[in-house]
Amino acid sequence: THQLKDIIKQRVYLIISGYEDLNDHDILRDDRLYQTLIGKDQALASSSTISRLERDVSVTNNIKNQSIFVNTFINSYKKAPDSIILDFDPTDFTLYGNQESRSYHGYYRDYCYLPLIVTCGSHILAAYLRPSNIDGAKHVWAILSLLVKHIKKSWPDTKITFRADSGLCRHKILNWCERNSIDYI
C-alpha cells in the first residue's frame, strides 16, 4: 500500500516534470529518480491507484488532503510565530471547454471556476475548486474555522488574522472571528 502523502508527491513531481497523464505513472513508477524524490526504494503507485484517489474526493478526503499543506506550513517553522495572517482569495480560472460545473461569471465576463486559495506568506494552506455560479464567500467560514483549529493545535498562542477583500465580508464570518479572537482586515 502507498501512503497518501507519497501518492500526492508522486503526482505533483510527475506533473512538474511534464508527465500530467496518468498512464505516464505506469511507466515511471519504477524510475529511481522519482523513487528517490519520494523516499521509496520500491515501485511507486500505479495509474489506477492514483485514479482511485483522484476520483474519491469526498469532503472528508479533501480535508485530509488539504491538511498536508497546513502540516508542511507548520513544520517549516522552528518555533511558533507570534502572529500570522491568513489570506483568503477567490480567483477566476478561465475554462476553454465544456468542463463539469462550467458556468459563466458576469464579473469576469467568461466561463470559469472560482477556486478559493488560502495562503500565509508564501505557503499555500488550502486550494478549493468551486464553480463560479456561487457566492464568492461560500465555504469561507468552514475553511477558516478548520484552518484555525488545525493551526491552534500546534500554536495555541499564535495570533491569527483573517485577511480578505470586501467580497468575503459576511456577518457569519466576522462574528465567528470576534467570538474566537481572530482579527480581520
Model-derived segments and spans:
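Basic, short loop/linker segments at the boundary and entry of helix-turn-helix/winged-helix-like folds
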Residues: 1-9, 138
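Short, amphipathic alpha-helical "recognition" segments used to contact nucleic acids or chromatin
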Residues: 8-16
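Short, conserved catalytic/metal-binding motifs centered on acidic residues
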Residues: 10-11, 22-25, 46, 50, ...
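DNA-recognition alpha helix
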Residues: 22-37
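Short acidic, glycine/serine/threonine-rich loops at helix termini
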Residues: 37-38, 95-101, 125-130, 171-176
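Active-site-proximal, Lys/Arg-enriched surface segment
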Residues: 42, 47-116
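Electropositive, glycine- and tryptophan-enriched low-complexity nucleic-acid-binding patches
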Residues: 106-155
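Domain-level cores of phosphate- or acyl-group-handling catalytic modules
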Residues: 134-185
